[in-house]
Amino acid sequence: MNNQKLKYFKSPAEFFNLFLSLLLAMPLTRVTGFKKSIYPVFSEKIALAVSGVTNCAYCSWLHTKTSLEKGMREKEIKSLLDGDIKDIPEQEAPALFYVQHRADFDGGFSPKARQRIVDFYGEEKVGHIDFMFQAVYFGNLCSNTVYSGRYDMVQGRKDLKFRLVYFLSLPVAYFIRKGSK
């Protein structure tokens, strides 16, 4: 883990809002265009870009492993985790900048940034990119919440709100850690 501040859930409401938006977006993954627009290596690049911003140790490890399995080079993986997108293909760079922007804004985005990416990719593909972002970001926050709670990194971690969100995040963090082994 580097010295960046971990992003984690601060309340059960934040957890449930992101979880609900993820559930509502799930039907997008059944659309045939999803697999064409978000091919496996591109999805890993999105995951690495988001995990680099949230500084998630579990997810960085998992997505490094799966990226290597899908044929990505170590240098490219490290660059994405470090937030360096200069050597990314022109067709992928806007999406990766966009998901980094969203992770920096705690899942939000500026309307101008979203409009620029819609102009570049079209609304359907941006919907797919948004879904990928939400899935990865949710996993990152769950993992970081558990990590932060376990390693005494959160002031007020005995607070009822934090304890509740910690326990809500445990199953997701468990499956991410299990997947990275």
Tell what function each PLM region has.
Residues 1-181:
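Hydrophobic alpha-helical segments
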